[in-house]
């Protein structure tokens, strides 16, 4: 999401993804042959996701970032010395509402990179269209995505889902 070449800003996104998929599949087959192993069944996916995206300060998958500023929470086991260390350092924390006796939740303020795409920068339809392009031209499976929908967009989203019903999964 943070690389314009891999977003709707690239007018040739469909052909870019198709070519990259061809190369990835061919490379997988070539190296499987060289190593004498079966080729992977599915090699294309949308990354980074979750924890890895945090390590490299990247948007997760094809999700737009939530906002320019947000609070990231991390859970720590109360028996873990790192949890006690973080508490001793004054990192904002509170007991987990589900496991208050055993888990502490730490809160970290996060600032998105300058010019990062956030959920308010794209309409729900733009988010869905980009997801559909990735499904059709990159992923060998169904990519997942979280779509942020404004109150006035629900009818258009419903129409999009109806029009693409046979392709809808992971949204």
What is the predicted role of each segment?
Residues 1-2, 29, 83, 158:
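Predominant activation on well-ordered alpha-helical scaffold segments within soluble catalytic domains
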Residues 41, 54-55:
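Short capping micro-motif at the N-terminus of alpha-helices
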Residues 1-4, 164:
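Extended amphipathic alpha-helical segments enriched in small hydrophobics
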Residues 48, 55-171:
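Catalytic alpha/beta core of large soluble enzyme barrels
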Residues 4-47:
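Internal maturation/activation junctions in enzymes
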């Amino acid at each position: 999401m943070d690389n314009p070449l891999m977003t709707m800003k690239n007018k040739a996104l469909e052909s870019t993804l198709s070519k990259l998929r061809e190369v990835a599949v061919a490379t997988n087959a070539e190296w499987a042959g060289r190593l004498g192993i079966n080729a992977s069944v599915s090699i294309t996916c949308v990354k980074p996701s979750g924890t890895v995206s945090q390590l490299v300060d990247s948007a997760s998958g094809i999700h737009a970032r939530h906002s320019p500023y947000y609070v990231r929470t991390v859970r720590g086991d109360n028996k873990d010395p790192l949890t006690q260390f973080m508490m001793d350092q004054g990192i904002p924390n509170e007991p987990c509402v589900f496991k208050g006796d055993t888990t502490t939740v730490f809160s970290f303020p996060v600032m998105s990179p300058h010019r990062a795409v956030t959920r308010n920068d794209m309409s729900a339809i733009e988010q869905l269209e980009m997801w559909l392009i990735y499904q059709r031209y990159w992923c060998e499976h169904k990519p997942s995505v979280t779509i942020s929908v404004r109150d006035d967009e629900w009818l258009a989203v419903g129409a999009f889902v109806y029009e693409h019903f046979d392709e809808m999964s992971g949204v």
